[in-house]
From Swiss-Prot:
One of its GO terms (molecular function) is rRNA binding. This protein binds specifically to 23S rRNA; its binding is stimulated by other ribosomal proteins, e.g. L4, L17, and L20. It is important during the early stages of 50S assembly. It makes multiple contacts with different domains of the 23S rRNA in the assembled 50S subunit and ribosome. The keyword Manganese does not apply. Gene3D superfamilies: Ribosomal protein L22/L17. GO terms for biological process: translation. Pfam families: Ribosomal_L22. This is Large ribosomal subunit protein uL22. It comes from Xylella fastidiosa (strain M12). It comes from the Bacteria. Part of the 50S ribosomal subunit. One of its GO terms (cellular component) is cytosolic large ribosomal subunit. PANTHER family: CHLOROPLAST 50S RIBOSOMAL PROTEIN L22-RELATED (PTHR13501), LARGE RIBOSOMAL SUBUNIT PROTEIN UL22M (PTHR13501:SF8).
Amino acid sequence: MNMEATAILRGARISPQKARLVAAQVRGLSAESAVNLLRFSSKKAACLIKKVVESAIANAENNHGSNIDDLKINTIIVDEGRMLKRFMARAKGRSSRIVKRSSHITVVVGPAK
């Protein structure tokens, strides 16, 4: 029986490149140590990823009756989301395009083997 629990945050307003830096730090850690690491990180992505990790932990507890001490982060994936395209006025009547990127963050927690 598969005891993995998943949580997904779609359309997070942070670039995937910045979110992947934080995701790489917590990949493979136990659930409790991952939340502690994210709590004290100063990056914006840490706050967003912490919410998703806590949601995945809550899903594991409620849906499968798992204990938080036995959980670890099996996979954490940051995919590209929708891009908002904006234009900024430049000199001599020109304009340049600004791309505001978003991310889809997926966290899967499961029992530590």
